[in-house]
């Protein structure tokens, strides 16, 4: 099978990867798959450095979307109360703490279908102020039209996160209030505004292996692949439609990380939700397969996260350093 990574693992162009090609790679013997993924990882990144990111929930709950996995959906039966948009100084204080703890990327998330005009001045102020601290900025605010994307770009936003979640085929089983095409439209608006794209998906929604492969093929075959690809493992949240979802096989999760690295060799592949359920050994395999970013802290939106102490211990044992640290 030819190595479709291109010269030095260059990213693929439109339509480059077929589902059949991706499936053949995914189904390689496990060691062969990881060997290929790790080789591309080394060509494009330092395998012993990782980016630490911090995610802050700047507006919690009350989202009108019906995403079956999300505790912040208004349809979730969990008693979560909607909050107002966080005060700017509180956001900045949390950003200072994140930077002091080693984060180089700061993501701000709001539980909205899309941001309203009245919220844009506060959002742009947050972006400008966080960037002034020397942090890379990211926001995830729901759908964006071209005008709002331009406003965020003008404020200096580095990344916008908007996951496609799963394959187009399986998507309607998870969400009915916004279409798969709506998500792709937002990604196009973000890209056209000159903001880098952060988009990935969630494993454990009830999807098949084919859906996981197709999700990654969709992302890899965008006009420009996302610079950032978060791979989430579902945390079943009480009160959501997927509260009793079956767990994901750990080795299948690692395979998805490896496939993401192969299809999008120049992208940051981010281990995001679900790490509290992952063993240290599973996370180590993910890093070997090409994951090179994680979210620090005790919480991730409304879900638990391993916390800085466990992460520091794991990275130290693996000899992996944060991007802000000086090599030993």
UniProtKB/Swiss-Prot annotation:
Record: residues binding [2Fe-2S] cluster: 107, 138, 198, 270
Catalytic activity: (4R,5S)-dethiobiotin + (sulfur carrier)-SH + 2 reduced [2Fe-2S]-[ferredoxin] + 2 S-adenosyl-L-methionine = (sulfur carrier)-H + biotin + 2 5'-deoxyadenosine + 2 L-methionine + 2 oxidized [2Fe-2S]-[ferredoxin]
InterPro entries: Aldolase_TIM, BATS_dom, Biotin_synth/BioAB, Biotin_synthase, Elp3/MiaA/NifB-like_rSAM, rSAM
EC number annotated for this UniProt entry: 2.8.1.6
Top-level EC class as recorded in UniProt: transferase
Gene Ontology biological process terms in this record: biotin biosynthetic process
Annotated ranges, domain Radical SAM core: 48-275
Amino-acid positions noted as binding [4Fe-4S] cluster in the UniProt annotation, renumbered to this chain: 63, 67, 70
Pathway the protein contributes to: Cofactor biosynthesis; biotin biosynthesis; biotin from 7,8-diaminononanoate: step 2/2
GO molecular function, one term: iron ion binding
Pfam families for this protein: BATS, Radical_SAM
Keywords of the record: 2Fe-2S, 4Fe-4S, Biotin biosynthesis, Iron, Iron-sulfur, Metal-binding, S-adenosyl-L-methionine, Transferase
Cofactor details (free text): Binds 1 [4Fe-4S] cluster. The cluster is coordinated with 3 cysteines and an exchangeable S-adenosyl-L-methionine. Binds 1 [2Fe-2S] cluster. The cluster is coordinated with 3 cysteines and 1 arginine.
The protein's required cofactors: [4Fe-4S] cluster; [2Fe-2S] cluster
Protein function: Catalyzes the conversion of dethiobiotin (DTB) to biotin by the insertion of a sulfur atom into dethiobiotin via a radical-based mechanism.
Subunit structure: Homodimer.
Family assignment from sequence similarity: Belongs to the radical SAM superfamily. Biotin synthase family.
HAMAP family given in the database record: BioB (MF_01694)
UniProt name for this protein: Biotin synthase
Organism the protein comes from: Brucella ovis (strain ATCC 25840 / 63/290 / NCTC 10512)
This protein's encoding gene: bioB
